[in-house]
Amino acid sequence: VREKITMKKILFLVSLLALFVLSCGAKASKDKNVIKIGVIGALTGNVAQYGTSTINGFKLKVKEINAAGGINGKKIEIVEADSKGDVQEAINAFKKMVSQDKIDIFVGEVTSGPSLAIAPLAQQAKIPMITATGTAFDITKGKDFVYRTTFTDPYQGVVVAKYAKSKGYKSITVLTNTGSDYSVGLSNAFKEQAQKEGIQVKEEQYTADDKDFRALLTKVKGYNSEVIFVPDYYNTIGLILTQAKELGINSQFMGGDGWDGIQTNFGKVANGAVFASQFAPDDPDQNVQKFIAAYKNEYKIDPIIFAALGYDTGTILETALKNVSDLSSKDAIKEAIKNFNGANLVTGSLKYDAERNPEKKVTFIEVKDGKLALKEKF
């Protein structure tokens, strides 16, 4: 009896093993027909509007790619995760995507802090990475597998300072969030260039936890600067603008691309402010209007710059991957991305410099009657 039971167990285990091998083979076969792209962004938390918009823009482009037959016969499969805007959450999600989901390419993160943390991990794993919207310069520095779609903090900081000079401004106060890589990077580049332009620059700082800016703004009001430059994200900027209005501050407010989204809840207090961007909803460019129509049809809301950059990231990957004969080669993929040089993007013509950062024109936006309006391209 013991012999029969043992034999039955053996036969049962052999059957299980056979099923396991077959299922693994089926999975491997299935995986060969897809390109797995990991996507991480804040879908909840303080910068959820950024994460949701970026990922939605990217998913819209992927939907279009798959509907048109995919990439060389392969469909794109998205593996998605919510970082909640937290660096450690983003790191954990990325590690899981590499070790368990076996992604081929990574798109993310959305903001600079998590992107800076993930970039060296992507480089080490040799996973081609594109951050659609992470602007900190060091994200790509020295990492040949890491690219971006947006311009960098130094790039836009320099251009905004030159733009301010072109408008004849002679005195500017900079408000810097010391707890934000984005704010510090943009602030430093702006201050350096503004001083080169002969502009008188003062600076005041606050922390990421601050909510009451009245004491700081009262001090700033005493400077009587023509411009107050605030390089930060829309939620914090909204509080600053609201309190500045209460204090009767009439300086011209300016900012970087983190302002996009200000129109949702703070359009009234932001009226007249000007900020750097790469996308204007009223831009008559055919690519812009076609994208806006498709996005509104898909999500029933107007897109912001983050959605446009997410969509453009999909276009960059589509173009690059179609030029790769062996899609299993990560080296071939990252080289194809490097060689991208396209004019058919929503955010304008783009080519990569030596550090895999895009060179493109800066679009200046003015908040008018609670909406974003194209001011000029500079």
Model feature map: region roles:
Residues 146-208, 227, 317:
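An alpha-beta-alpha
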Residues 297-307, 318-372:
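Segments of small-molecule ligand-sensing domains
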Residues 1-36, 378:
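Short, low-complexity disordered leader/linker segments with a strong preference
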Residues 97-110, 130-132, 173-176, 224-234, ...:
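Periplasmic-binding protein-like
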Residues 27-34, 49-56, 68-140, 149, ...:
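Beta-alpha junction/loop-to-helix N-cap segments that form part of ligand/metal-binding clefts
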Residues 38-59, 81-88, 110-111, 175-184, ...:
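Extracytoplasmic "Venus flytrap"
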Residues 186-276:
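Extracellular/periplasmic bilobed ligand-binding domains
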Residues 241-311, 366, 371-377:
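Extracellular/periplasmic periplasmic-binding protein-like sensory domains
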